[in-house]
């Protein structure tokens, strides 16, 4: 359900009653029934509300469910306001959903947005969803991918300050993300994908002239190793030119080295329809590609398009793995 004070609850409620969603899957919403009731937007179908205890004893899921996690006092939730209580609740919903997926009770997890400041205030030190899923599933390697029919990007680093990015780069890490990206796009396209890899510095370093030799030390060796593994990859690309129409059409996905290098062009092209996918997990996880939107929370103004796209992608991935 995401942060209770954000737009997550209302867009999740829409998913529970959306005919196109119900044709694709049987949704199970981990959240708080009290919060959802405050929205005064009841589902038109026969959505059942059960407790966590009842959920643990549930063997068959035959209709949409709301799992009442009782993680927060609904009366104390203030729409659009950051709070430790909401941060903790958002985390607990994720934790319960991961347990369900790892236990094979559900086929995939689709997440609504959490608020990173609220998460930190609650004492939970993960900077975001990607890091939570990686840690709780004990994934050996993972990365964030933003997927759409207009542009697909993946990130070598995510929720860290720009000054910390160079220290997090290594040949092994860049290669991991190239491999994860190629594997995902191979599955999506049913052919060998074309992968581009951005440089870090202006002009991709100009052969070491700008920056700290990151392209020479990390990107070029990783690209060379990926080619040895028969991956169709090109890089380092000049970052400011990589996302022009002519350049991006040469690639099925582009590996970027830090958060905003990938997020800015992606959101300019696919803000409403983009899907966040965590690659490398032992389970399927997709997400909306937007935040909690506190400025419009609980006002009926939120757009659910990204959530519905994330559900559609998750269903497709589950079907590809032979799950129902």
Language-model region placement:
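Contiguous, glycine/small-aliphatic-enriched amphipathic segments in soluble metabolic enzymes
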Residues: 1-129, 172-257, 261-276, 281-284, ...
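Beta-strand-turn-beta hairpins that frame and shape the catalytic cleft
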Residues: 60-64, 148-153
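Short acidic/polar capping segments at secondary-structure boundaries
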Residues: 114-116, 124, 150-151, 159-162
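Active-site glycine-rich loop that binds ribose-phosphate moieties when present
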Residues: 131-140, 160-186
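Short, flexible loop segments at boundaries between secondary-structure elements
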Residues: 135-151, 281-295
């Amino acid at each position: 359900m995401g942060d209770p004070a954000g737009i997550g609850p209302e867009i999740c409620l829409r998913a529970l009653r959306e005919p196109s969603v119900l044709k694709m899957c049987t949704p199970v919403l981990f959240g708080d029934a009290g919060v959802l009731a405050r929205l005064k937007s009841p589902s038109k179908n026969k959505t059942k509300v059960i407790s966590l205890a009842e959920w643990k004893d549930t063997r068959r899921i035959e209709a949409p469910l709301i799992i009442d996690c009782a993680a927060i006092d609904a009366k104390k939730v203030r729409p659009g306001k950051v709070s430790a209580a909401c941060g903790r609740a958002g985390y607990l919903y994720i934790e319960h959903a991961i347990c369900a997926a790892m236990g094979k009770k559900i086929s995939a997890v689709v997440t609504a947005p959490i608020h990173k400041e609220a998460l930190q205030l609650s004492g939970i030190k993960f900077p975001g969803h990607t890091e939570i899923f990686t840690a709780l599933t004990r994934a050996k390697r993972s990365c964030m991918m933003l997927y759409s029919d207009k542009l697909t990007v993946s990130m070598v680093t995510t929720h860290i300050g720009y000054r910390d990015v160079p220290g997090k780069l290594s040949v092994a890490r860049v290669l991991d993300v190239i491999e994860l990206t190629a594997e995902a796009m191979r599955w999506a396209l049913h052919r060998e994908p074309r992968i581009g890899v951005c440089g870090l510095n202006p002009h991709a370093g100009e052969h070491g002239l700008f920056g700290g030799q990151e392209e020479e030390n990390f990107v070029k060796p990783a690209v060379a190793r990926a080619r040895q593994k028969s991956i169709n990859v090109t890089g380092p690309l000049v970052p400011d030119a990589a996302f022009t129409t002519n350049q991006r059409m040469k690639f099925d996905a582009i590996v970027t080295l830090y958060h905003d290098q990938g997020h800015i062009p992606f959101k300019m092209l696919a803000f409403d329809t983009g899907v966040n996918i965590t690659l490398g997990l032992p389970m399927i996880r997709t997400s909306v590609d937007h935040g909690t939107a506190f400025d419009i929370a609980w006002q009926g103004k939120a757009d659910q398009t990204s959530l519905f796209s994330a559900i559609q992608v998750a269903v497709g991935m589950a079907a590809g793995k032979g799950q129902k």
